[in-house]
Amino acid sequence: MGRLSGKVAFITGGARGQGRSHAIRLAQDGADIVVSDVCGPVEGNMVKDSTPEDLQETARLVKETGQRVLTREVDVRDLSALQSLADDAMAQFGRMDVVVANAGVLAWGRAWELSSDEWRSVIDVNLTGVFHTIRATVPHLIEQGQGGSVILISSSAGLKGQPFTLHYTAAKHGVVGICRGLANELGEYDIRVNSVHPAGVRTAMMEVPGLWKMIQEKAETLGPIFMNTLPYESMDPEDISATVAWLASDDARYITGAQIPVDFGTCNR
């Protein structure tokens, strides 16, 4: 019997990468899974688009664990669609215990060259999308009256001044503000809220064209920002999922309002 047996987890951005890994890991720990993804292009996003086939593969892998899964193509910028999915999840599974706000996009450029549309797109997905996920799910956790765990996927860029991704860095810092404020609001309901801060995860987001070239060109002045304390350059999504699974479980029942770096110590630099 897994440590999440009998629980239900709601995960955004789960068609591939970290989101898929989180879905599989929480299912392996015994949770039934609700997983969404936009499954298509997002304006201004430089990461390869996810597809409906990607989301279907996530569902297949979750089912292989023996757990139930509900999937839907949803854009986190669409609050009503997220609310509809949360309502349907409650109707199908009867409960909701864990929320993982994972959906995100990435683009790069020098701050003074970003267009308003590029800024808005990243902020709308990476910050407003987190708010929408909370708005759609937290009322169910409160009404259920059995506590819960809300896990917000931020980034090492949410804890330091990462250059060339000002919109992304601003959004991920904003997620920290959401985490800390929401943790105080939900404490009376025994609902915990924490943020996770990955760095260097081997997903499509690491393959954004041009970003690493720009970083290398500025290595003399900005290189230390990207240096790790531990002797590694990248990690697997499953390494982040281990922290997500821990925060979702009763093993972390007294932890709330925390920022958890999983980043080789880069934020310690």
For the regions a language model picked out, list residue spans one by one.
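Short-chain dehydrogenase/reductase
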Residues: 2-93, 107, 211
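Active-site helix of classical SDR
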Residues: 134, 171, 179
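A glycine/serine/threonine-rich, flexible loop-to-helix segment
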Residues: 43-50, 188, 200-229, 239
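Short C-terminal tail/terminal secondary-structure segment
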Residues: 160, 231, 245, 256-269
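Short, small/polar-rich loop/turn modules that mediate ligand/substrate recognition or access, typified
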Residues: 187, 192, 255-257
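Substrate-binding pocket helix/loop in short-chain dehydrogenase/reductase
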Residues: 110-111, 118-123, 225
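Residue(s) in the substrate-gating loop at a strand-loop-helix junction
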Residues: 155
